Amino acid sequence: MWSYIAGGVFLALAMYFIVQGIRCGAAVRESKNRLAAYNAQTAALSYGEITYVDLGEGEVILSVHGIFGGYDQAYDTCKDFCSDYRIIAPSRFGYLGSDVSGDGTPASQAAAYVELLDKLGIDKVHLLATSAGGSVAIRFALDYPQRTKGLILYCSAMPPVEKPEKYAEYAGPPPFLCNDYVMFLLSPMFELIMGMEQSTIYSMLPINDRKVGVILDASVTNPDMARDFGEYPIEDLQVPTLIFHAKDDKLASYIETERAVARFPNCTFISFESGGHLLTGHAEEIKEAVSDFVEDRSH
């Protein structure tokens, strides 16, 4: 009897994994069709290629996406602004068509952005960064204040308030999870683990094409502000900053953001009781605040 039960359970599990594999394959194919609709462009830079979306007119917002991102997520973060501003949305190192320069540090990523802006004939930008992209945007603002009009951070990585005695050398998912099928299987747990809807998986696919970037973020980008604390003199920032964060964010600590805000000169901090890491439900408030921030510095 028990052998029949065990066999039935095994068969049910096997069928489940097969069905999920079929669903995952279909979702990956659809994700590649979705990416094609962005009409992304590729520029040859000194170290390799960078792929980006360039849409809209007016003041320029350079969108710096987070982990599991790419030009698609970089653009989608700013799509509500496309009718008013020019959006430059590149894939960062290792994501969707963008090569890695050197060790892939935030400083190298910022330098690549400058090279892209030079190629596009753009002098100054507002930086808008989400999550892991915050380290790169902050690095850009510190290294190139003459190219930066303002810094906007959405539930972003934040610098520690003092040099940490220890920190995570690897801050991200282990490489074996950076796989279309494995992450698709885990997506029903997104709400519990990350506070995100299961459907978020569809904006992350194809994960196999983002894996290099994810591992680079986990090993280099995310630990950088702790590892090289002295290289991030936040108090010396020469540009204004606008920071958004939700108190129920499960991925980027709201408490750490509250502490870090005091380090930013000329900073506006807008917090939300809810919304999670994606600031769900606050599109209108964010659009108004960002528009006011950009317009104040466009004259």
Roles of regions detected by a PLM:
Residues 54-97:
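Conserved HGGG/HGGXW glycine-rich cap/lid loop of the alpha/beta-hydrolase fold
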Residues 108-125:
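Conserved acidic catalytic loop of the alpha/beta-hydrolase fold
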Residues 124-162:
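Conserved hydrolase catalytic core segment
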Residues 151-180:
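Flexible "cap/lid" loop of the alpha/beta hydrolase fold
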Residues 171-173, 177-232:
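Alpha/beta-hydrolase
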Residues 237, 243-245, 249:
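Short beta-strand/loop motif that positions the catalytic acidic residue
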Residues 250-256:
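Conserved alpha/beta-hydrolase "acid-adjacent" motif
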Residues 275-287:
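Catalytic histidine-centered segment of alpha/beta-hydrolase-like enzymes
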